[in-house]
Design a protein with these regions (language model features):
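Soluble "head" domains of membrane/secretory-pathway proteins
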Residues: 1-16, 20-21, 32, 36-42, ...
Length: 215
């Protein structure tokens, strides 16, 4: 009887260990995904309307730019490069992060002649109607910026409410975001339910843009 009881206790112990292992595996997998593959953010501001609305929750891929190259049109999450959040605190995603659309790659010259005129990249005008907020000018003022090596130029889709690269040309980074500060590229909106959908990079908008002189 004693031997049988010991066997039974051993079986109970093995069953408990087995349960703990199988419960722990999914938790570990989720943690690894969160750490290495995906980021999750709540969007508090309207700087990316109507692509992303305040209150939307988005998923980002951490594989770009670590594994895959950034492309013009990507919706990127990045660390605040030089106190941008002091001017655009409502865009804070938690921590010191912002979300914008990538417009210029290293070597690109991004420019606009002001209200009513399109953004040009390396002298080629782009049609941003696929993502820019309706009724908003591509830029309310003129500018011309050449993107330096290791940096990108970003703008919000709601140009009238986005303190983006255009507004920070006087800071230490000249309004450019170091690629090393980009932590992910937007994949999809997952909440609220009526807003579920992919985050389109609209790479086709930039199809005719030539490579920059210093790329």
């Amino acid at each position: 009887m004693r031997h049988a009881k010991e066997e039974n206790n051993s079986g109970d112990s093995f069953g408990l260990r087995d349960t703990l292992v199988w419960c722990g595996i999914p938790i570990i997998i989720v943690l690894l995904i969160r750490i290495f593959l995906l980021g999750f953010y709540v969007i508090p501001s309207g700087s990316m309307m109507n692509t992303i609305e305040p209150g939307d929750r988005v998923i980002t891929s951490k594989l770009t730019p670590k594994v895959f190259d950034l492309k013009r049109g990507d919706v990127v999450v990045f660390k605040d490069p030089d106190h941008w959040l002091q001017q655009e605190d409502s865009s804070k995603l938690g921590g010191d992060y912002l979300i914008k659309r990538l417009i210029g790659l290293p070597g690109d010259t991004v420019a606009c002649e002001g209200p009513g005129n399109p953004i040009t990249i390396n002298g080629v005008a782009i049609d941003e109607s696929a993502y820019i907020r309706e009724g908003v000018d591509p830029s309310s003022f003129a500018f011309s910026v050449t993107v330096t090596e290791g940096h990108v130029f970003v703008m919000g889709d709601n140009r009238a409410n986005s303190a983006d690269s255009r507004y920070h040309q006087g800071d230490s980074s000249h309004g450019l975001v170091p690629i090393s500060d980009v932590v992910g590229v937007g994949l999809a909106k997952y909440w609220p339910l009526n807003r579920i959908g992919g985050l389109d990079s609209h790479h086709e908008v930039f199809a005719d843009v030539p490579e920059g002189s210093a790329a």
